[in-house]
Amino acid sequence: PLSSPHRGSLLTGMYPNKSGIPLNCNSDRPISSLREDVDCVSDVFSNAGYDCAYFGKLHADFPTPNDPQRPGKYVEDRVPAWDAYTPKDRRHGFNYWYAYGTFDEHKNPHYWDTDGKRHDPREWSPLHESGKVVSYLKNEGNVRDPKKPFFIMVGMNPPHSPYRSLDDCMEQDFNLYKDRPLD
């Protein structure tokens, strides 16, 4: 399945033609964006008193020129824009945020935190994201109420085509499959 429609289905429990995301989201496709009027699984947990956290790739919204560091600009200069910043009012109950729209430089990822600050960790994205999730679970920095239950959703980007690229994986993993047909 395509990235955006699949994530829309995971969030809403709906088929892509009902979630608002029939195609991968980019700035040329205003018809493909998570519906504002739908309850997502995160809304249900949040309304039941859970702390809700999202980590990693979301890719469920039509990109708009809303870069927190460059007001009125897209978060990337590529045309069409694929990556997107998700403002608080579009996070469907997630009160802890460490995510991005879509970005395929897995060894040089970026993320926006709950307050819209951009982070550029220069670490392979699955390793970085899993570390952030563990930190959240341990409640390092008191990022959640320890008396409340919590719900975590993680959107890992890799593996992602092209599969014959060291940009998509760590070298030791690449070497395991370098002589096998993956295409």
Where is each model-derived feature located?
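Formylglycine-dependent sulfatase
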Residues: 1-183
